[in-house]
């Protein structure tokens, strides 16, 4: 799940859902 969070500005990338959210798995 590295590098995918670059597209998420104010939120962090969630590996569980595969989208930008305010938490991590």
Curated annotation (Swiss-Prot):
Tissue specificity annotation: Expressed by the venom duct.
Disulfide bonds, paired cysteine numbers: 1-16, 8-20, 15-25
Transmembrane domains' residue ranges: none
Outcome recorded upon mutating residue 10 to K: Alters the kinetics of action and improves reversibility without diminishing conotoxin potency and specificity for Cav2.2/CACNA1B and without diminishing the serum stability
Cellular component aspect of the GO annotation: extracellular region
Top-level taxon of the source organism: Eukaryota
Cysteine amide found at: 25
Subcellular localization, as worded in the UniProt entry: Secreted
Principal location class: secreted
Entry text on domains: The presence of a 'disulfide through disulfide knot' structurally defines this protein as a knottin. The cysteine framework is VI/VII (C-C-CC-C-C).
Function: Omega-conotoxins act at presynaptic membranes, they bind and block voltage-gated calcium channels. This toxin blocks N-type calcium channels (Cav2.2/CACNA1B). It shows a higher potency when Cav2.2/CACNA1B is only expressed with the ancillary subunit CACNB3 (IC(50)=0.1 nM) than on Cav2.2/CACNA1B expressed with the ancillary subunits CACNA2D1 and CACNB3 (IC(50)=19.9 nM). The Cav2.2/CACNA1B block by this toxin is voltage-independent, whereas the recovery from toxin block is voltage-dependent.
Record-given protein name: Omega conotoxin-CVIF
Lineage: Eukaryota, Metazoa, Spiralia, Lophotrochozoa, Mollusca
């Amino acid at each position: 799940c590295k590098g995918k969070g670059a597209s998420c500005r104010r939120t962090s990338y969630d590996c569980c859902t595969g989208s930008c959210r305010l938490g991590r798995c």
